[in-house]
């Protein structure tokens, strides 16, 4: 039998105020309604900005009150640095031939802005800078877009022959070879570069060869002499920037003094082999250098007996690379050309789009080298003519 509560107990419970909320097992209690909050417009500045009617009326606010979109932390690319997209039969033909032989060019790997101009010329005028030893570099310079690897693939033993074959087909008068750094190789790839130059000279004896080389750091001077005495005409190695900026621009294994030593040893190695070569280096502007530092760099290059120097604008290849400090005006490039020529450099190329292997400079150097060859031949002929007839006949 269930015992019921007494009547007094029921009355006492009825008089106690209840704060409990009634809920059903199958229905969630409804929370108190929240006060609606006004969401902030995503493009508030644009909503408060100009309308189409404002532009029609001409009432445009001052520049400091306008909304600016995009990257404002880097200087805007000037019009004189903009270049057309490369096209044309010559461009397509060179690209197809390079692919067929499995060759790489620094023109493509380094995203050179002059590729359309250099590859777009007719036969005898088109130029391409062949990049030897693959497309993966053991260095990681902050300005360069060439791929980096600690362990690149082995060298292609057929590359020297394929390179010489391609160049002989083009019918060029001047060719530029460059390469990635290969710190993983015992000689840094010097023998591979020298072999390529020798094979080019065998297939096309009259062609002039320029080699833009690595610094061969820790490999010794003999590897520099190997390349310099291989039959090339121009030995190029770039200091890239002033000494103070070198640690921030180039790979930590590269050094300004080491680069000067490479250029000096190249002249010594060629002379020891009975050859006469030109040496060449390049400087990028717009990476944070100061005027006096450029003067000092030029003085040290001349002290190292460098014959040719080029100036060009640093252009950021991707957002992963270091930013441009400033865009140098064409007038300043013209100034540095005059300064360098006054210091005794044989040839100076200076301009926003000039690169170390720029064809305008190649044509000038080609003429200089041909004149030197002609002068040497004339001197030899004059020496021969002064000999007695019987000795001259033996010679």
UniProtKB/Swiss-Prot annotation:
Residues 1-24 form a transit peptide. GO terms for cellular component: mitochondrion. One of its GO terms (biological process) is lipoate biosynthetic process. Its cofactor is [4Fe-4S] cluster. GO terms for molecular function: 4 iron, 4 sulfur cluster binding; lipoate synthase activity; metal ion binding. [4Fe-4S] cluster 1 binds at residues 107, 112, 118, 357. Binds 2 [4Fe-4S] clusters per subunit. One cluster is coordinated with 3 cysteines and an exchangeable S-adenosyl-L-methionine. InterPro entries: Aldolase_TIM, Elp3/MiaA/NifB-like_rSAM, LIAS_N, Lipoyl_synth, rSAM. Its main location: mitochondrion. It is found in: Mitochondrion. [4Fe-4S] cluster 2 binds at residues 137, 141, 144. CDD domains: Radical_SAM. Its EC number is 2.8.1.8. The keyword Protein biosynthesis does not apply. It catalyses: [[Fe-S] cluster scaffold protein carrying a second [4Fe-4S](2+) cluster] + N(6)-octanoyl-L-lysyl-[protein] + 2 oxidized [2Fe-2S]-[ferredoxin] + 2 S-adenosyl-L-methionine + 4 H(+) = [[Fe-S] cluster scaffold protein] + N(6)-[(R)-dihydrolipoyl]-L-lysyl-[protein] + 4 Fe(3+) + 2 hydrogen sulfide + 2 5'-deoxyadenosine + 2 L-methionine + 2 reduced [2Fe-2S]-[ferredoxin]. PROSITE patterns: RADICAL_SAM. Keywords: 4Fe-4S, Iron, Iron-sulfur, Metal-binding, Mitochondrion, S-adenosyl-L-methionine, Transferase, Transit peptide. Residues 122-346 form the Radical SAM core domain. Belongs to the radical SAM superfamily. Lipoyl synthase family. This is Lipoyl synthase, mitochondrial.
